[in-house]
């Protein structure tokens, strides 16, 4: 009675074909200008989908509002009048699953002025 199961022969160590390792790449974008930030986000996601990568995001993080209140008068006299200044920092997070070489091609797009980009690579 012949069996269809045949044991595999052990191959030599180090001669296996190297598989392209998939990494989880997190791209964090932050800016004071929402329009520029959204434009860079859409360009990144479009480029990743053209390369047929798995994309999560853009995830909109809470806007940080930094407020400073100061007196208008330089000296201590006069009516107490106050100036209120605020700075809004918007943040987006995009997760890609691919090799670092492909991400380098995707992130070579033109980034709008005022948009900060942070790329973190982790094993998935």
Swiss-Prot record:
SMART domains membership: Ribosomal_S10
GO cellular component, as recorded: cytosol; cytosolic small ribosomal subunit; plant-type cell wall; plastid
GO BP, one annotated term: translation
Record keyword Transmembrane helix present: no
Keywords (A to Z) from UniProt: Ribonucleoprotein, Ribosomal protein
Signal peptide start and end residues: none
SUPFAM superfamilies according to UniProt: Ribosomal protein S10
PROSITE patterns linked to this entry: RIBOSOMAL_S10
Pfam family, one: Ribosomal_S10
GO terms of molecular function: mRNA binding; structural constituent of ribosome
PANTHER family: 30S RIBOSOMAL PROTEIN S10 FAMILY MEMBER
Family: Belongs to the universal ribosomal protein uS10 family.
Protein name: Small ribosomal subunit protein uS10z/uS10x
This protein's encoding gene: RPS20A
């Amino acid at each position: 009675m012949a069996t269809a199961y045949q044991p595999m022969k052990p191959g030599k160590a180090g001669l296996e074909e190297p598989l392209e390792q998939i990494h989880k790449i997190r791209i964090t974008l932050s800016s004071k200008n929402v329009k520029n930030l959204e434009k860079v986000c859409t360009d990144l996601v479009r480029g990743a989908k053209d390369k047929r990568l798995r994309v999560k995001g853009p995830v909109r993080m809470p806007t940080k509002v930094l407020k400073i209140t100061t007196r208008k008068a330089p000296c201590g006299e006069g009516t107490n009048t106050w100036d209120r200044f605020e700075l809004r920092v918007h943040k987006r997070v995009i997760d890609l699953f691919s090799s670092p070489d492909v991400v380098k091609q995707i992130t070579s797009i033109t980034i709008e002025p005022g948009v900060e980009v942070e790329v973190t690579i982790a094993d998935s």
